[in-house]
């Protein structure tokens, strides 16, 4: 139910906003926002934001801003879908205000808490674009910007989270598309110079996810050796202009706290190489059989270890139910939205296997993507246990991820004797990693998607 804002305010901040989501290509864009603290008491306050569309009519929008003080928290809101991750707050349009005509406004409000000062936000974004306060008219003959040239890492530089998006050095939302290794303890021959050359040049992959199992003959058997292998693959990805997702591949036991000490040791070592600007840290692959509270506790103990050495890198946090945001356990994103990890510059993992996870899972991701920064750090074109590729569901998933600008890594860039592998068995004994003769049905499908031109905005 809509609520009216109080007429008297204790503080007001007016900021112009541009780049509302939803207008057609080459539409005039622009809007303004008025932030009002309507009441304040010890440790709490109520605020409102009035958005007025100054440009062409829009359908669909997400407002973002940063709480200036670390002690400020969103408690609950209305007239929008609200969420907070660290200090970043987002509000997405709902059914009755999702469409804004020229000159139309939406009145939003929320209750917050604070422990120190309670300053008003000074900057707002819409879909990751910094607000400027003016209307931008389309050119009579709009120019066609050529795709940015250079490798993904060279173009985008140091990544960060802005609102619910992964953003590049130009503060623009981007989508990374790439492949995950299988367990590096089993498929080392698949990750040499020849295969990674083809991944970067022929597959045009933006990223390599390095899956380092902790158990199952993995890290716990040789911490120093596996750390060295991971660092080597990060360097090889960097040499080819790809981002590297360092995956602490926990699976069994499902509670990541079982490996807390190992995680601290491992991430302290790999984060010490903080000159690497192509690294994203994934701290727990697929928590399962464990509560979100326990996963959150683990994350809040591991992230400070990374931040002590590498303060700027993005960190991906696994979610319960095999990183399904709890959907596989009958929950949804609300448990994360209402109890987020107390850290900034983080994203939340969502994993799916297309033949098992279909419309109901896609229906869960759509609203979650307006409330949380999501990264599909692992997905398969098959079921979680079977071989056959579900092409229809896989395409539906990839179309959705493209639409929502959610980054992804496909399981797996390997010649494992399983349906989700990109290559036929024995491929990694040779030098061909691209032709139809070595690709499986899954490999051919995924390669056809990630080898298309990237959309990396630079202005």
Swiss-Prot record:
Top EC class for this record: hydrolase
Keywords: Carbohydrate metabolism, Cellulose degradation, Disulfide bond, Glycosidase, Hydrolase, Polysaccharide degradation, Signal
InterPro entries, sorted: CBD2, CBM2/CBM3_carb-bd_dom_sf, CBM2_carb-bd_dom_sf, CBM2_CS, Glyco_hydro_5, Glyco_hydro_5_CS, Glycoside_hydrolase_SF
UniProt modification remark: The linker region (also termed 'hinge') may be a potential site for proteolysis.
GO biological process: cellulose catabolic process
Signal peptide residue numbers: 1-27
Annotated spans, Linker ('hinge') (Pro-Thr box): 136-147
Protein name listed in UniProt: Endoglucanase CelA
Organism: Streptomyces lividans
Protein encoded by which gene: celA
